[in-house]
Amino acid sequence: MQSFYAERFEREMGCTEPEWLGWLPNAMGDVPWQRGASSAKAAIGTGSFEVQWRTGEPRRIGLATIPRMHMQFVFAGLDDAQRYTFMKRFDLYMQRGGG
């Protein structure tokens, strides 16, 4: 989790698209949202959020192969605090692993 979320940023995630789609509803929380073929859009107050994704080439580290998804996050009409509040929940639901 970060302390600041820009209006637009990109990430890589180590998951498959079916895994991502399984986690997405809980990560979105109670905000009304719609899913497209490779995107999701949400209304947050008077602003909006959109995430677009595409499958990338798997990352290979020695004999291990890790799936990779490229994500682009875009907020419109939300201030720093609103973006942080939404992404705090989103990131907690998307977080995997221990440590």
Regions found by a protein language model. Give the residues of each.
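Short amphipathic alpha-helices in soluble, non-transmembrane regions
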Residues: 24-26, 85-91
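A short, structured beta-strand/loop element
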Residues: 46-65
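A generic structural signal for short beta-strands and their flanking turns/coil linkers
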Residues: 7, 38, 47-49, 67-71
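Amphipathic, hydrophobic secondary-structure cores in small proteins
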Residues: 40, 44, 57-60, 73, ...
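A common structural junction motif
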Residues: 28-31, 91-98
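Terminal, regulation- and interaction-focused segments at domain boundaries
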Residues: 1-27
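Short, conserved charged micro-motifs
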Residues: 17-22, 79-85
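Short beta-strand-to-loop capping motifs
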Residues: 11-15, 73-78
